[in-house]
Each structure stands twice: as structure tokens, then as C-alpha cells.
Amino acid sequence: MNVLNKEVFNQTKKVLGLIVSNKLVNGFSKQFKSYMFQSPKFKPIVSTDNDDKKMIYLCDTLKKETDIPDQLKTFIKENDIKVIEKDISLNYNNFSYEQVLKTLLPKDVGIPFSFERIGHIIHVNLKDEQLPFKYIIGQAILDKNIQVKTVLNKVGEIDTVFRTFKIEILAGEPDLVAEIKENECIFRFNFEEVYWNSRLQYEHMELVNTFKKEDIICDMFAGVGPFALPAAKIKKCKVYANDLNPSSVKYMKENAKTNRLESKVEISNLDARDFVKSLVEKSIPFTHVVMNLPSTSIEFLDVFRDIFLNSTIPPPIPPPIINCYTFTKLDESSDLIKDTIKNVENVIGAKVPSDYVCYEVRDVAPKKSMMRITFRMPTILPYVGSLTTASTTTTPTTSNTNTSTTTSTTSTSTTTTESTNTNNSANNVEDKNNKKRNSTEDSNETNETDSIDTNKKLKN
């Protein structure tokens, strides 16, 4: 059974009809709507041969007059309404998506209700037991969703370096170039050539809302720009965006032009590590790093470890705030947040500062979650810019006990800033969508170059 047979739904039903005066129709519709015949694209109120009266069809559960509830019986009697039996004709168009698939699929095959909408495209992930009926499911989705032109199914897992996957068109046109509006920006791209996930729309804006106008953003795995373009358009940030996929870069450039952001977004097509190194070599003081490649993002933290922890040469920029998305598997004895932090620390070879923010973005599979961890990259060296003013600048740094002050001098090249980072506070952290979010003990740290402004990071 691979083709949807619409003729199966051609049928005639016997229902009760009421001949109602025109002046009573509106009142009847409001008071007794639940008793009227309800079906997609079916009009339960129709004209009659008498211009002063309308026919109102009752729901098919009221098969005879004795089935009519007392309240409706009273209304019928008081207004001298005639009750008759009528035949109505129904076809495929009069049945909902769920009704169609309940009719056509075996009882032990579930109906897919969860799918992603990308412009005119609907993307489904069918289960094994649904695959023999994939074309029926695809056609039903196409027919029952307005403005949808293409229905496709993912074939296999995301296993390419560009995060793309093989697809199969189940119904509709083979047009995979979609255009959508998200977070005040227009995005256009070929869904087969790039990575896009509409389910992350809220998370895209959640992170962008932590940025300020003066921030400079380094987006290492930018895709077609779901973080980069809103950061530039809504927050007016300067953005350096990169992706290894030439198709992503092509569409990101087009999208930047469409949204008039060419002067705010500089786009590269490099390996992510080379991209970061190029910005550092140019002394571009990016303040936030976005790392949205959950399967391998954490591995790329080594580029920051080499710049801020392993190098003997002071970096030309201050340590940025890292916003890293990653997948974390949850075993019975483990904790998502603790495991995420541990995975980060294993790569950077240092403790994550105590003012980190870490929470679960969404479940992606049983015992596997997409996480976001935000922290300032620790360092053991002052950046070059701080050395030029060290002899004349005094930076008070108050410890947790409020008893000590550290003064910067030209001999501070060996000063450890990691220890001050661990005293920073994470205030006003909300519980987003009842998911875990963690920040540790408060302190009075005031060194702006070493602490994360959590009022900037999270909504109060």
C-alpha cells in the first residue's frame, strides 16, 4: 500500500437536519455549536428553497430525535423547528490528517505528528514501522497543510562534516530552496546543501539576547547565519562569521545582502581553528565566541587553550566568553551539567571559571541532550593591550573576603587571572523552560575584564 487512495473516503452519511429561521441561526450557532456537524471544508449551515430559512446539520452521533439532548429539544419545541433526516456526501477533503491516517494505516503503526517546517518544506523523521507507508503519510501531510509544497524524509543519520543528510521526497515538488523569516531576518537556502534546524529558533534568540551593541562576535560554525545575522541586525554587533561548507557561506552572503548587513557581517570559508587564529593574528578583540557544532564543538576549544593557556606569548586580545553547544549523554549515575563541564575541562586543561552557565537546550535522543555552556576562557597571561598601560593602571580586584587588592604593574606578565575568574558571580539566572541551569556561589568580583556580566547573558 504505497499510494493514497482518496476514493476510500467517498461516502454518504445520514444525519439529522433542522430547518431554522434565519433570525435564529446566529444564536443557535453560538449556543449549540457542539451539536452541529463538524468536518474540514464542510458547511453545516446551508440554504434551503425558502429564503427565510436555513438547514443546520447536526453531528452524526445524534442519529435519531430521541438522541437530541433536552436543552436542544426545548429550543426546537419553543421555536417550532422542523427536524428531518438528510443524506450528506463526504469526500477526502472533509477528513483531517489524523482521520485520514487512522483510516489508512494499520492500528499498530503510529501517526507522525512531529515534523519540522522550513518555509514551504516539511521535514519528517519516519520510524521504521512507518516506512512502508511513507508515500501515504507524505501525501496526507502535503494535502492537509496549507502552503506546503514539499514533504521529505531524512534518510540515515547526519554523518557528513557539513552536517547535511540524505533526503527522500515523499510528496510534492522537488524544490528544496526554502525562504523563511526568523528573529527579524530573512533566510534563503537549499535545505539539502546546508544545516538548518527550525526547532532552535528560540535558542538562537536566547543567546543573541545576551549580546550588547559593543560586543564583537566570532561565530565559528555559522551555517547560513541563524546566530550571526540576528546579532548584527537586532543587537547591532560586529560579527565575524565562518563556515567550512561552501554552500553555507554562499547562502550566508546572500542572506547578509538581503538583510542589508554586509557592513556588519564579515564572512569566511575556513577551517574553524584557522578562522580563530586569523582573527587573533589581526588583533580583532572578539568578546563572544559562538560554537554551534554540537557533535564536535568541544574538540575545537583546543584552539583557545593554545592561545590563552599554552602559549608563552601574551595574546593580543583579552579572553572572550565562550558559548559552546555540545551533546552530552546521560548515564544512570551521571549528571548532564557536571559531565558537560568535565568534557570542557578535559580539552582546555583548566578549570571552568565558577561563573559559568550551563543548561539543557533540548532532548535529541533517549539519554542524550543538547547542552549550552557559557564561560569566560581562562588564561594565565595578560593580553598585550594590558601590558602597555600596566605601569600606570591600577585595577582593584576584591576577593570573596573583601580583604585584598591586586595592583597591576609591569611585572604582572606572570599574574594568574584564572584564580580571579573563579570568584565571579552568576546572578539572576532563571530556570528556562523548567530545564536545568547552573551557576555557583556569589562573590563581589568587580574586574570587568575577567567576569561575565550575567545581566547581559540572561534575561532576569
From Swiss-Prot:
Gene Ontology molecular function terms on file: tRNA (guanine(37)-N1)-methyltransferase activity; tRNA methyltransferase activity
Keywords per UniProt: Cytoplasm, Methyltransferase, Mitochondrion, Nucleus, S-adenosyl-L-methionine, Transferase, tRNA processing
Enzyme class: transferase
Acidic residues bias locations: 442-451
Keyword Methyltransferase: yes
Record Pfam families: TRM5-TYW2_MTfase, TYW2_N_2
Origin superkingdom: Eukaryota
Stretches for region Disordered: 390-460
Binding site for S-adenosyl-L-methionine: 204, 243-244, 271-272, 292
Reactions catalysed, as given in the entry: guanosine(37) in tRNA + S-adenosyl-L-methionine = N(1)-methylguanosine(37) in tRNA + S-adenosyl-L-homocysteine + H(+)
Subcellular locations according to the entry: Mitochondrion matrix; Nucleus; Cytoplasm
Family: Belongs to the class I-like SAM-binding methyltransferase superfamily. TRM5/TYW2 family.
Oligomeric form and interacting partners: Monomer.
Record-given protein name: tRNA (guanine(37)-N(1))-methyltransferase
Organism: Dictyostelium discoideum (Social amoeba)
Gene name per UniProt: trmt5
